[in-house]
Amino acid sequence: QWVEGKFTRLFEERWSAWNQLPSVATSSWTGGALACMDYFQLKSKRVLVPTNTFMATPLAVVKSGASVVFGDCNRSDLCLSYEAVVEAAARESLAAVWLVHIGGHIAFDAPKIAEFCRQKGIVLLEDCAHAHGASWNGQRPGSWGDAGVYSFYGTKTVSTGEGGMLVSKHPALIEFAKGYRNYGKPTYEVEGLNYRMSEFTAALGAVQTARME
């Protein structure tokens, strides 16, 4: 079985055990990011993105029909600053924030940004493409916000060549993402496309996840 089989489920289970959140495997980071953007209905809305990130982050916003607002980063960790989020929220009608964990560690301002977004009703999404294996006081990436998305591209700490993983504390988003990655199956209520992870890719990921500390 090349797709939708036991290795995809095993990879998701092992990632969930490490990340402490329900997980959905995708064919890329982009697939997971687009699922988040669609689920939170961010089309035509303003989304804050840090200036220091890979093009995938703002492009996911653009492809979802939302508008990109750029925010400055801290010199100390090269990640989005709390001050930039506060300033952008005062200046713009922000609907969401992409918090990118650059360089293998959690963004230093993650707790403050998360609390601010909760108070203001702003969706907080975490780009965890660099954050495999990271934690802060036992808390894993993707758990500060509404969702987190990992990449398993060839340059990542955990690599399967290509691939992604969406994690979230919201059960409804997890179910949405399962349909989104597979043309909306089985009910076709979700307007998804093909973002499935292959069984070969998932097998590589499951083995590596078992070796993570």
Residue spans for each PLM region:
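Phosphate-binding glycine-rich loop
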Residues: 4-46, 60-62, 70-72, 139
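Structural detector of well-ordered beta-strand residues that form the stable sheet scaffold
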Residues: 24, 48, 69, 123-125, ...
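Conserved PLP-anchoring active-site segment centered on the Schiff-base-forming lysine
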Residues: 34-92, 96
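Aromatic/hydrophobic pocket-lining residues that form π-stacking "cages" and hydrophobic walls in ligand
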Residues: 57, 113, 177
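Hydrophobic/aromatic ligand-binding patch that stacks against planar heteroaromatic rings
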Residues: 59-61, 116, 200
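Active-site phosphate-binding strand-loop segment of PLP-dependent enzymes
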Residues: 77-160, 167
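Active-site region of PLP-dependent enzymes
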Residues: 131-137, 144-213
